Amino acid sequence: MDFTLNEEQKMLVDTIRTMGQREKFKELARHIDETGEFPYDLLKKYADLGLLGMTISAEHGGGGQPALNAILCIEELAKFSPMIAAPVFESNVGPVRVIDIFGTVEQKKTIVPGVCRGELSVSVCMTE
């Protein structure tokens, strides 16, 4: 099995790295840690780049891409901070992916497209 990234995947990782430097994600991560406030305008930037819902079926507003592409983005964003990567995780391999596969028709119509457009965010709540 060949684990070499193709040119498109290399460009994707490079784009994420460049965006993180340009948008000063390290400083942003520090701000998030200090204040506990997430900058939800970041969702729109992610949506504009097609990072939200990359793996979600095109039928529900996603990109229909392989999971590896999303994982590469999540990995690169997490180098800045797990919180910076969280929306991309949640919209590709986390709760939105679960809704895309197992959700009701209504959930797929109302939740998934909004997340892919950066208009909604989702999370998971757990307890012991």
What spans do the regions from the language model cover?
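Generic N-terminal amphipathic, Lys/Arg-enriched alpha-helix
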Residues: 1, 23-25
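Intrinsic disorder at enzyme termini
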Residues: 1-8
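Residue-level marker of structural boundaries
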Residues: 18-21, 117
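A non-catalytic, amphipathic alpha-helix used as a structural packing/dimerization or gating element
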Residues: 8-19
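Glycine-rich flavin
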Residues: 25-128
